[in-house]
Amino acid sequence: MAGAFEVQIRSVPADRAAKHAVALSEVVLQHHRADGIQIQAQPLTGGHLLHLAVAGCVFNDLYVLAEERGIRLTEVRVVATGGFEGEEPTVSTGVSYEVSVSGEASEEELRELVGEVDRAASIPDVLRQETAVSLSGVQVQATR
């Protein structure tokens, strides 16, 4: 996973939101490894996004390693849970995740696959070791 990454989240005008918005639980997205994915997180807060990063990383890595091993996965589900406590700054209570996986392999091979992903998945590994987060720029456009 080495390399630079950029993601973006942005607001859209009310008319576009009214015309195109659907509940997140109803959205099925294309995926570069699975036939499609569905994200379940309501509401979509920063805490949900943190846990989604863990679940998404594990999900992706399951497909990557399965492909390397010649295993066809037929169903994958990763559920990440956790929370926050305290006043500002809040502190994470930790993130745990569960994996359900079905595929064209033995039970032992699938368990080994999950174990290897748990040891190698980048996002859980980064969180286990902590990482620096900094604000690198601000752009404002005043309207009054």
Label each residue range with its predicted role.
Residues 1-52, 62-144:
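Extended beta-strand/beta-hairpin segments
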Residues 57-58:
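Alpha-helical metal-binding/catalytic segments enriched in His/Glu/Asp
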